[in-house]
Regions:
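Core beta-strand elements of the Rossmann-like FAD/NAD(P) dinucleotide-binding domain
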Residues: 312-320
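Dinucleotide-binding Rossmann-like beta1-alpha1 core, especially the glycine-rich loop
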Residues: 114-185
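Active-site/ligand-binding neighborhood in enzyme catalytic cores
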Residues: 23-28, 38, 193-296, 300-303, ...
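Glycine-rich FAD pyrophosphate-binding loop
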Residues: 88-110
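N-terminal secretory signal peptides
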Residues: 1-39
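N-terminal export signals
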Residues: 36-64
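C-terminal segments that line or cap access tunnels to active or ligand-binding sites in enzymes
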Residues: 4, 318, 327-463
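N-terminal Rossmann-like FAD-binding beta1-loop-alpha1 element of flavoenzymes
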Residues: 69-95
Length: 528
């Protein structure tokens, strides 16, 4: 799964290009076969849906409360809350400490930009394979809207002109054939603990260099892939490992390409994804302390963990600690040597890469892209102020509509909330090239455009959008992020594996579940 609908489409285009080359068929036939596969899968999903989705990961019948250790959870985002939910289900109470005045972290819905609509300041998309997020949505009765089935096409605007998906695939067919040797040579699961020589070599090759070599003579695809991966991981391709790209060139165990991937559906919660946060907050019975920023973590000779908040010299005490804040933020916490982080764990915390994605949501008077251009609002371009865009909350778009501008890499980092109006104006000028006439359709209040910028790179409680491995970090730190340090456990999207759902809301939920299970195992074994 990708962080935007259009990149997911591009990845499927890459898959089709490989499939067409492998089967020696035309691009048009490959596209027809994709349509057939899509319809078959959707029929299956509709039948499966009639039987109902899975129950909550922690169903309503929780165990009775039992005496247990003092459990402190640092961070009240999806990871921390799902961890507390699992522990509560097993009968153990925990105390959550959240630095912000609200819960949710990067799961943060915006219901004020356009009345009656919900856009997402943070995590937006939920795939059919995201079982915990779907189960939570069902448990709390939260409606879902499909964001794949929306009518209309995505747009590719590069080198001063529009390109069709078929044209992009035709170019991709030549390029991906150059990469097959590398795809076959990598293990497919490179990590600190398991890697081959190709993993090491390609991990230490930045993606920009890799694309320069393998896309030589194909400037369209070089630009498309560059913009797509800057958007997907939030960092310039010169700051990304080439394994970010190669790991998605999917092969099964027989090295036969799976041309149509594993999912063609994704959702957004119609009235805002942080409905899951609200549901969990209402469900949890243990203390939740907001406005509590961890500033120091220590340990005494009795083995108790000492947690200092907001610069206080008087600690809270715990027997076990789950840290679910981003490593970018943890770097600013004084962690005393007595806590016992290993050198490898410390290196992972201090060096892991994060993207600089920032989201600007802009209100429009209508779905101009749909009515005038038969587009679903998705576009990828090499224009200075339009990278990756999509329509948000289509289900609630009546007299108004919302478009999300996904600023990434250097552009995302450079955006500023105090320059919102000039930035939106520059965006609309470029968007007017992709969808001529659209600038006049943007909604204004007086002389100002109605828009909101959520700038995660400068948010002191995030300091980045989500995990983005730098060159060398698959073989250098993948697998270390989730490792416990004694009775200090770690959760958060960054601690879920790259090969699972790192960078997604589902990854945060899964990491919370894992951390809780680590605590439960320690209780069972008598370690705590």
């Amino acid at each position: 799964m990708s962080h935007s609908r259009l990149l997911e489409q591009l990845r499927r285009s890459i898959q089709i290009a490989q499939f067409c080359e492998q089967e020696n068929i035309s691009t048009s036939e490959g596209l027809e076969r994709r349509e057939e596969a899509t319809h078959s899968r959707r029929r299956f999903l509709s039948m499966a849906g009639a039987a109902g989705f899975a129950l909550s990961p922690m169903a309503a019948f929780a165990s009775r409360k039992v005496p247990g250790p003092r459990i402190a959870i640092i961070g009240g985002g999806l990871a921390g809350l799902s961890c507390a939910d699992r522990l509560q289900f097993k009968g153990y109470s925990s105390t959550i400490y959240e630095a912000s005045t609200r819960l949710g972290g990067r799961c943060f819905s915006n219901r004020t930009l356009v009345p009656g609509m919900a856009c997402e300041n943070g995590g937006e998309f939920i795939d059919t394979s995201h079982k915990m997020m779907i189960a939570y949505a069902n448990e709390f009765g939260l409606a879902k809207e499909s964001v794949i089935k929306q009518a209309g096409d995505e747009r590719f605007y590069f080198a001063g002109q529009h390109w069709t998906e078929a044209q992009v695939i035709d170019e991709l067919r030549v390029v991906v054939s150059n990469m097959q040797g590398d795809v076959r040579s990598i293990s497919g699961s490179a990590s600190f603990y398991s890697k081959n020589q190709s993993d090491i070599n390609l991990d230490n090759t930045d993606l920009a260099t890799y694309l320069d070599i393998n896309c030589a003579g194909h400037p369209l695809i070089r630009s498309v892939l560059d913009e797509a991966y800057v958007s997907e991981y939030g960092a310039e391709t010169s700051q990304q490992s080439s394994l970010n790209f190669l790991s998605y060139m999917r092969f099964n165990k027989q090295s036969k390409f799976e041309p149509f991937g594993t999912s063609d559906e994704r959702y957004h919660l119609t009235h805002g994804n942080d409905g899951v946060i609200e549901g969990l907050e209402a469900k949890l019975l243990g203390p939740i302390n907001k406005g509590a920023k961890l500033t120091r973590l220590s340990r005494n000779i009795a083995g108790e963990y000492l947690l200092y908040f907001n610069g206080s010299t008087i600690p809270e005490k715990a027997d076990v600690v789950i840290i679910s804040i981003p490593f970018t933020v943890l770097r600013g916490v004084q962690v005393d040597p007595l806590v016992g982080f290993s050198a490898d764990k410390t290196r992972a915390i201090q060096t892991i890469g994060y993207g600089t994605n920032a989201k600007t949501m802009i209100a429009f008077n209508s779905r101009y892209w749909a009515t005038e251009f038969n587009s679903n609002g998705g576009a990828l371009s090499d224009l200075p102020n339009v990278q990756n865009i999509w329509e948000t909350n289509r289900a609630n778009a009546t007299s108004k509509a919302i478009m999300t501008d996904y600023g990434s890499g250097n552009r995302g980092a450079a955006l500023r909330t105090n320059l919102l109006q000039s930035q939106v104006n520059a965006f609309l000028n470029d968007l007017n090239v992709v969808f001529p006439g659209i600038k006049a359709n943007a909604t204004k209040l007086g002389s100002n455009y109605i828009a909101h910028l959520e700038h995660w790179p400068s948010n002191p409680l995030a300091l980045g959008s989500y995990t983005s491995y730098k060159p060398g970090q698959f073989t250098g730190i993948e697998g270390l992020n989730s490792e416990a340090s004694g009775l200090v456990k770690f959760a958060g999207e960054h601690t879920d594996s790259f090969y699972s759902y790192q960078g997604f809301m589902e990854g945060a939920c899964l990491s919370g579940l894992r951390a809780a299970n680590q605590v439960l195992a320690d209780i069972k074994s008598g370690t705590i």
